[in-house]
Structures are given as structure tokens and as C-alpha cells.
């Protein structure tokens, strides 16, 4: 009987430990950028009207920047909102031909910040 009780205690401890690890892993899973417009690493022929960032889960977009080829900041009219969303759209000013970098920072529901960047290029169709 004691042997059965010891085996059950070990089994219970394994199940509790596994549950804690799985719960912690999903709670701290970070949301990734799934897609964007202009598309990541795209060469586009015309001026985009906006930048759209599509994430795999709901986040707050804490910051978004647009940088030119020399990594100079191009002002965007973006105000931080505490709304949790999957998709954010930011208007873009008139841009010249060239390479641009979108830099973003989000905060997930777990309070962790995630950041990333991607490039796109505007090429003339002349």
C-alpha cells in the first residue's frame, strides 16, 4: 500500500510540474509580426498611403518609426493607444524613391515588450 502511495505522489508531482511549465510557457509566449503592408522586403512601384502591421495576437503598439536609408527618422502621426489589437495602420507622409525601415515596439498582455523592424523599397516605374 505504501508503494502505491509513493508512486501516486511521484505521478502527482510530475503532473503539477508539467502543468506549471506549460502554463508559464503560454503566458510568456511573445506575439510575432505575422505580416505587414508594404510587405516585408518588398520593392514597390508607388507611394504607400499607410503602413499596416498585423500581429499574431492582441498587443498594444507602443512605438512605430519610419527610417530612411540613412536611418533618419521620418515623422509619423502616431499616438500610442492602450487598445489591444492585432492590426495597426499608420498614415505615411509623401516619400521619395529609396529604402525604408519600419521599426516597431509592442507590449503584450503579459507586460513584455517586443520589438522588430523590416525594410521595403520604393522604386520608380520610369
What kind of feature is each model-predicted range?
Residues 2-15:
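Bacterial N-terminal signal peptides that target proteins for export
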Residues 28-62, 124-126:
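N-terminal non-catalytic regions of secreted/periplasmic and cell-surface proteins
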Residues 52-122:
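Acidic, low-complexity Ser/Thr/Gly/Pro-rich repeat segments typical of extracellular/periplasmic
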